[in-house]
Every structure is written in structure tokens, then in C-alpha cells.
Curated annotation (Swiss-Prot):
PANTHER family: ARSR FAMILY TRANSCRIPTIONAL REGULATOR, DNA-DIRECTED RNA POLYMERASE SUBUNIT I. It comes from Methanocaldococcus jannaschii (strain ATCC 43067 / DSM 2661 / JAL-1 / JCM 10045 / NBRC 100440) (Methanococcus jannaschii). This is Uncharacterized protein MJ1460. It comes from the Archaea. InterPro entries: NO_sig/Golgi_transp_ligand-bd (IPR024096), V4R (IPR004096). Belongs to the M.jannaschii MJ0150/MJ0739/MJ0745/MJ1460/MJ1642 family.
Amino acid sequence: MAFMEKIFPDILEAIRNEEIIKESKKIPMPYFGLFALVIFDKVKELGSETSLYEIGEEFGKMLSPKNIEELKKIFKLMNFGDLEIDENKILLKNPPYKIKLSNPPYQWVSKEEPIHDFIAGILAGCLEEIFKKKFVVNEVECVSQGKDKCVFEVKEVDELNK
């Protein structure tokens, strides 16, 4: 059994427990942010066949939220920001759907293009777990571009093929 397979159930249980999260020792966000940026830059620099989006998508599937409210709660606990999602629009099948994210990580970064590929992947993986359908999520507006919120466009894979 691989190391990750041995510890994953314990980690998954811990991230769902608010008390454990609140009591855990935390890496100060600027240090963790710098660490993550170095990893993200290195992945892009090396031209990895695995993109940040794909890594995020797998992470989102592992988080396996049961519903939209749990997804919002997980994002809040991870300090990824405040999600605005209208579950009814997704259920009504009127794509593309919009998800807004306030207070995301790295909002102090100034770039010409959106920077949250990893978060887009997390959203895709989580939505797949909730709705049992494949989604593609693309960040179309970002706070790094001077916008008030990040905006993600969500499409079902079936809709892409039409």
C-alpha cells in the first residue's frame, strides 16, 4: 500500500472536522502562499504533462463534498475564499454557469490573466463528486486582474460536445 493510501483516510477525516482544523497549528498564509507559488511556477516551468488544473481536479475529487453547502464550507476552512454558487442554475441545465469567489488566495498578485487554475480544477472535481457529472471550469475574471471577484465559468462536458 502506498504511503498516500495509508494516511489519506485520516487526512480526509481531519479536513471534515472543524474542531481539528481550528485547533491545528497553521502555517502562516504568506509562507504557505509562497511555497505554493514556487510549486505552481515549477510545474509550469517544467512543462509538466500534469497541469495545475488536473492536480486541483484530483484534489477536489478527494475532498468529495456531498453538496454545495459543504463545498462552500470546505473553501472557507481552507482559506480559499467565499464561494457564490446558485445550485438551482446548475440543476436547471442552463449553461454556462457562473461561480464567483471573493477573498481568494493571492489576491495581492497583479497579472494580466487569471491565476487560479488550481482552484478551477478543485471546483471541477468537487462539482463532479456532487452532481456525478463531468464539468470543465475556466476562470474568466480574476482579482489579480483588478476585478472585485474571481469568476469561473462552468460547463458540463456533455454541453461542450454540442
